[in-house]
From Swiss-Prot:
Positions that bind Mg(2+): 324, 330, 333-334
PROSITE patterns to which the protein is assigned, alphabetical: B5
Enzyme's top EC category: ligase
Organism: Methanosarcina barkeri (strain Fusaro / DSM 804)
Leader sequence residues: none
Protein name as it appears in the record: Phenylalanine--tRNA ligase beta subunit
Molecular functions (GO terms): ATP binding; magnesium ion binding; phenylalanine-tRNA ligase activity; RNA binding
Subcellular location per the Swiss-Prot or TrEMBL entry: Cytoplasm
Organism ancestry: Archaea, Methanobacteriati, Methanobacteriota, Stenosarchaea group, Methanomicrobia
Amino acid sequence: MPVITLQYDDLEKLTGTDKETIIKRAPMIGADIERVEEESIDIEFFPDRPDLYSVEGAARAMRGFLDLETGLSKYEIKPPKVSISVSEKILRIRPFLGCAVVRGIKFTSSSIKSLMDLQEDLHWGLGRNRKKVSIGVHDLSNVKPPFRYMAVDPGFKFVPLDYTEKMSMTEILEKHPKGTRFAHLVRGFKKYPIILDSDDNVLSFPPIINGTLTSVTESTTDLFIDVTGLGEAVYTALNIVVTALAERGGQIEFVKVVRPDSGELILPDLEPKTRFLTKTEVRDLLGMELSIEEIVKQLERMRFGAKALDEETIEVKVPAYRADILHNYDLVEDIAKGYGYENIKVKIPETYTPGKSHPISLLRAPVNEIMVGLGYYEVMPFTLTSEKINFENMRRQKTDDVTYVLHPISEDQTMIRTTLLPNLLEILALNQHRELPQKIFEFGEVVNNEITGQHVAAVSIHPQANFTEIYEVVDALMREMMLPYEVKESEDPAFLEGRRADVYVNGKKLGVFGEFHPEVINNFALGYAVVGFELDLNDLIGQS
């Protein structure tokens, strides 16, 4: 979780209160205090509240909690003077774009650092290390609109941030620190994303690096903000950044985004989303009776717009910068925070309900211990994936046992995974900048025919990775679990013929292991030999 350093003088100015009150009340808005210094406080905010990843966002929330300023924050937005066109070709590479202009900002070195920290924390919290969301912040005075978001050849040259000489985009990916770190995000594409002004000056090579021309300094007053990505989280990130800048006195200005697929968009869209909450929902979840007036009061303390429609129903306006409100339960949680958990009376349960470990946990613990003992690190990736990752990249045929997401919000999360190995290979692809060998495993859930199963899988990448290495790992795991097994020749297309095997226990196939096929390695843009295994452990659950 991100740890944000907040300067007292900045926070006191933005909240209108003193540092003693800040230290005392900060945990109540959803944070843990990590460190208290003479001039600053380090606060760890929960990952579901990216709107608190800046001093401006934290101050906005704290003003409400302290009853200094309650209800929905309102931001004036000026008509658009800047436009940006989106090319057809970029839609196949990085299709989502959100933009805004913020004028009249007075920067200091600390406020610039705060903005850059917010940018990087959002890359982590919303962007999955820039894959889903990447943010560019530019000095608008050094470029000339209208702008263009397009795809260009890898040989295109410009001067990247912190450099003085022109480099081709290929050279940036090979030599620039940011390029080598994030090259995997554009690897495999024949053209790369770029944002240009009307004179062909480079603003950004998203999601890698900005051009040096638009660097933000203390003399900067007007900003152009671009957010690119793979889904609608782009717009949430844009809203968080522009409202944070508005809290510091900036004037938000619309930008006209001209798309080839959906026409014109006028961004940012700061219109709040409307939800309807009932008094009964609050009572049933909190276990206590609150009046309709009290519920409205606590929602406004948490910076929602709230209005009682009758004695049972409240209309709630959710700020456009809140990424965490997915259900009415999230509203009730904020009501509890506003009311104060310390004010909720303790009630001892009337029935005695002793707990015990779940059978899955009883199997997970020894398996994890064995894998860690074999030198593997545990990872816990997402269970949502795509057909491309789950099947195409693995050279496997699509099956009929897939559970699909009805309304996916991004192209890389359209189904629930049926196997663990593709996720592990994705993680290796994201960590190519780290030392080899890399050995990771997961004990996790897969879903086939809408039935949840438990699998364990592991992969190892380094130049000498081979069949014998992974065979020894599988053998050690099976021996430690005291499972007699046999291996037979496999036909799994994800692995090399002659260097793959199926695992059988009591005549039933349990899994597969071997050396991955070069095509699979290339599909995940991995540069070294990779071996792996995956075992279905469902039949072992509940066994002593």
